[in-house]
Design a protein with these regions (language model features):
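Short acidic, hydrophobic short linear motifs in intrinsically disordered regions
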Residues: 63, 68-81
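Basic amphipathic alpha-helical segments that dock to polyanions
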Residues: 66, 88-101, 115
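Short hinge/loop at the helix->beta-strand junction immediately C-terminal to the helix-turn-helix recognition helix
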Residues: 71, 100-103
Length: 130
């Protein structure tokens, strides 16, 4: 990066800089396209899975909410997913037991648990971060 940038000011090598920059742009676009396809594949895979695992008519609504907020507090889920509270709590329990959700911070006293959808986060990070 710096050598190409220096070559612009030192040698007037705008062609080299533009080539470098556009190559990086293409590489990043390919990476982002792969991530988008991986996320879509994960959604399709988990859509069928969650319906079976939870046996709930609200399973897809819960999955959509989790995909939109892959790190969340259990109380935020229960309060905002717009499904009955007992069902929301049961869905969280099932998803934790099945390993779809991981505890980033366990519940303690009045503090709710902080949960993460690690598969989605790992795709977006491009590594096993969670």
């Amino acid at each position: 990066y710096y050598s190409r940038l220096l070559a612009v000011s030192r040698d007037g090598d705008w062609t080299g800089w533009c080539s470098f920059f556009l190559t990086a742009l293409i590489d990043q676009a390919r990476t982002n396209q792969r991530k988008a396809l991986d996320i879509l594949g994960l959604y399709r895979e988990r859509k069928d899975w969650i319906a079976t695992a939870t046996r709930s008519q609200y399973a897809v609504r819960a999955l959509d909410w989790i995909f939109a907020r892959p790190i969340f507090s259990s109380s935020d889920f229960v309060d905002n997913v717009q499904i009955p509270r007992p069902t929301a709590n049961r869905i969280i329990r099932v998803l934790r037991q099945e390993g779809l959700l991981k505890d980033l911070r366990p519940a303690s006293g009045r503090r709710p648990a902080i949960l993460a959808f690690s598969q989605l986060l790992n795709i977006t990070e491009g590594r096993d971060a969670f």
